[in-house]
Every structure is written in structure tokens, then in C-alpha cells.
Design a protein with these regions (language model features):
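Short, surface-exposed beta-edge/turn micro-motifs
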Residues: 47, 68-71, 116
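Short, conserved beta-strand element in jelly-roll/cupin
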Residues: 66-81, 121
Length: 132
């Protein structure tokens, strides 16, 4: 049994065997991400990172997740999620309660129209980024 925690500061790893591991000290530092990858390596492409992230400004980069589909659920605010598919940009406008699936390997970014929060369920293995 777990005590309540704030998902915006304690992310959760979903792994094989229907496990859910809270990550109270999660960090986007390279050192932490390398340790995270090693710790959950046995989950392979089935592992997912669940996080609640503020959407305060348009992203300054693009990312893609070759290991699987990413679910993005906008809880508040207004965001245009932009996917690059076959060299074309596809804009998916999102409002509160709306969701989108980023297919495996599809580059995506976000343009924030009204600040809010989004819930991400991400297959992190092999994630790549590039400048916006």
C-alpha cells in the first residue's frame, strides 16, 4: 500500500507484471536517466513513465519514442500538439480532458496556447530529441 503523492513531483514507472513504482526523486539529468534506464531495463519496450507536467510555454524541442505509443492527456489549458508525419506537420488542438496518441517514432512538439497541465504515459526506451 502506498501513501498519497503528487504526480507532478513523484513520477511512476509502469512495468512488467502490472507493477507501479513511484519515483520520488525523479530528475531529467543524464545521470538519473541512465540509472533509470538500467534499473528498469528488464521491462524492455513495455515499460512506461507516467508523469504530470506543467505546460507553461511552447516547447523548444521535438522528441520521439521509437519503443511504442505515447498517450498525452491534457488536463487543463489549451495546447496544439504537433506531429511530424511523412515530412508534414499535423496539428492536433487539445483542450481540457482531450487526449492524443503519438505513434512510435513520430517526432512531436507542443505549442502552448493557454497554460495548463498534461499527463504523459511514455515508452521512454530509446527516446530521442532534437532542437525546435
Amino acid at each position: 500500500m502506498s501513501d498519497a503523492f503528487n504526480l507532478s513531483s513523484t513520477f511512476v514507472h509502469l512495468g512488467l507484471g502490472a507493477t507501479a513504482t513511484p519515483l520520488p526523486d525523479f530528475s531529467w539529468s543524464r545521470e538519473y536517466l541512465d540509472a533509470y534506464t538500467e534499473r528498469f531495463d528488464a521491462d524492455g519496450n513495455e515499460g512506461r513513465l507516467v508523469c504530470l507536467m506543467p505546460q507553461e510555454a511552447t516547447w523548444d524541442s521535438w522528441e520521439r519514442h521509437p519503443a511504442g505509443e505515447e498517450v498525452v492527456i491534457l488536463l487543463s489549458g489549451r495546447v496544439d500538439l504537433i506531429q511530424e508525419i511523412d515530412g508534414e506537420e499535423r496539428v492536433v488542438p487539445l483542450g481540457p480532458g482531450q487526449a492524443v496518441v503519438n505513434p512510435p517514432g513520430v517526432w512531436h512538439t507542443a505549442r502552448v496556447r493557454e497554460p495548463g497541465q498534461a499527463l504523459f504515459i511514455t515508452p521512454g526506451r530509446g527516446t530521442e530529441g532534437r532542437p525546435g
